[in-house]
Swiss-Prot record:
GO process annotations (BP): tRNA pseudouridine synthesis
Keywords per UniProt: Isomerase, tRNA processing
Isomerase in keyword set: yes
Name of this chain's protein: tRNA pseudouridine synthase D
Catalytic activity, reaction form: uridine(13) in tRNA = pseudouridine(13) in tRNA
GO CC annotation terms, alphabetical: cytosol
Length: 354
């Protein structure tokens, strides 16, 4: 991850569970990386929006959405999905298509060697970005080298303590290109740019600042425990609360992984934190005025993100023929790479954009 003199690469970010001693390869084939979307609600079975549950292999989400629009005879904007899925994978995800007053076409016409329609139904609302509970992963690591007999113990440690909730390398584009584009945007905010690209570049800049804050907390040993002045977030929620006193109840809830210290998603407004937490954040971002001021000029509002990512269902299938299998689920907006990097060393630039 490059694009700024002080930008650390993703693999340079500090790990919470010690240095890894095992190296492996990811995505040797699409079948090695499976993602199943967890929608989080059941379609009603009626309404003007058709809902399609699709399995795709080696297919781009936008490309599938365009095929759906052509078959249904609607505009691309009438097709919705909750999030982009990795093209170099076998993934299942839901799509919606607005068919007001129209019958369903024969959805079997979508099917090919790389696309299968698993189910179709109806719902009363369009599927919007981010409207999912999370994703379930099954990942096979191949070509394992080094000292790998500690993987099962590391998985147990992650189940107990979670991992740092870094934004993954996908967020920043190949070679940190999205950060470079963000700096160009900050230098000339009036430059005409596609709305989606603008959002992508601003998100990359804000994610970079968050990763710096989190890296400082990992080095300090407080990414998974509270410090004075912290704001805490609830598991599975964006809600947070501020406390000036770290009493036994707060620490017990942190240890139980029901609440987590949080970091600032930079923008205009009060970051909420104070004291030690605020001082640590200021140190982490002292050299980042260009990003901080640019995000504020572009109108982003301040937000918060948990510093810790729980992975309570992480399972490990033992090493065999220099390969192993990992299964786990993550909430929306988090990254499988943040889990994998605590287990094995791999090339983050080999991870495709999503």
């Amino acid at each position: 991850m490059t694009g700024h003199p002080d930008c650390p690469g993703f693999d340079d970010l500090p790990r919470a569970h010690g240095e890894v001693t095992c190296r492996g390869r990811i995505r040797v084939s699409p079948e090695d990386f499976r993602v199943d979307e967890i929608l989080g609600f059941e379609p009603t079975g009626q309404g003007e929006h058709a809902f399609l549950h699709i399995r795709k292999t080696g297919e781009n989400t936008d490309h599938v959405a365009q095929r759906i629009a052509r078959l249904a005879g609607v505009k691309p904007m009438d097709v919705g999905y909750a999030g982009l899925k990795d093209r170099h994978a076998v993934t299942t995800q839901w799509f919606s298509v607005r068919l007001a007053g129209k019958a369903d076409p024969d959805w079997r016409a979508l099917e090919s060697e790389s696309i299968a329609v698993l189910r179709h139904t109806r719902h009363d609302r369009k599927l919007k970005r981010g409207a999912l509970a999370g994703n379930r992963f099954r990942i096979i690591l191949r070509g394992l080298e080094g000292v790998c007999d500690g993987l099962e113990a590391r998985c147990a440690a992650i189940r107990a303590a979670g991992v740092p909730n870094y934004f993954g390398p996908q967020r920043f584009g190949h070679g940190g290109r999205n950060l470079q584009e963000a700096l160009r945007l900050f230098a000339d905010p009036r430059r005409r740019i596609d709305r989606n690209k603008r959002s992508l570049y601003l998100s990359a800049a804000r994610s970079y600042l968050f990763n710096r804050v989190l890296a400082g907390r990992v080095e300090h040993g407080s990414w998974n425990r509270g410090v004075e002045g912290d704001a805490f977030m609830f598991t599975g929620s964006n809600a947070f609360f501020k406390t000036d006193k770290l009493d036994e109840d707060i620490q017990r809830r942190v240890e139980a992984l029901t609440i987590h210290p949080s970091g600032t998603l930079w923008g205009r407004g009060d970051p909420v934190i104070s004291g030690t937490a605020l001082a640590m954040e200021r140190v982490a971002l002292a050299q980042c005025a260009e990003f901080r001021e640019g995000l504020e000029r572009c109108g982003l509002e301040v937000g918060r993100r948990a510093l810790r990512l729980p992975v309570p269902d992480l399972e490990f299938a033992g090493v065999e023929d220099s390969a192993c299998e990992l299964t786990f689920s993550l909430p929306a907006g988090t990254y499988a790479t943040t889990v994998l990097r605590e287990l094995v060393e791999f090339d983050p630039q080999g991870w495709p954009d999503t």
